[in-house]
């Protein structure tokens, strides 16, 4: 079961978090605590309403175009690179990431579905 909260653009949240990491996100002056009962936490963009979307899923994440108001559009590759540069999560073969559905399996990302533009 996925849970979704929205963060207004301009408050760019940190990207992908490892399992068992607990943190609190300040959202509209309310603290939302995300605990270790999820596998992957990914901050995405809902392109329809142009808000950042925090998607908590079980092992699968849907990668979409990431919007950064300060720097313009970011590709998935740039987003992954940003995460890696911040040492949030080290991914192998980061340049191979394309829009699609991915499954995190034993430390590697496997694409399970390709989403063409």
From Swiss-Prot:
This is Uncharacterized protein 247L. It comes from the Viruses.
């Amino acid at each position: 079961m996925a849970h979704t909260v929205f963060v207004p653009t301009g408050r760019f949240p940190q990207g992908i978090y490892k399992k068992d990491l607990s943190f609190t996100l300040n959202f509209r002056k309310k603290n939302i605590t995300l605990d270790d009962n999820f596998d992957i936490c990914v901050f995405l963009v809902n392109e329809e309403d142009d808000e950042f979307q925090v998607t908590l899923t079980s092992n699968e994440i849907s990668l979409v175009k990431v919007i950064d108001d300060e720097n313009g559009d970011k590709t998935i590759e740039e987003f992954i690179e940003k995460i890696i540069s911040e040492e949030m999560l080290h991914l192998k073969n980061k340049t191979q990431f394309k829009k699609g559905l991915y499954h995190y399996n034993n430390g590697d990302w496997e694409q399970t579905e390709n989403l063409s533009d």
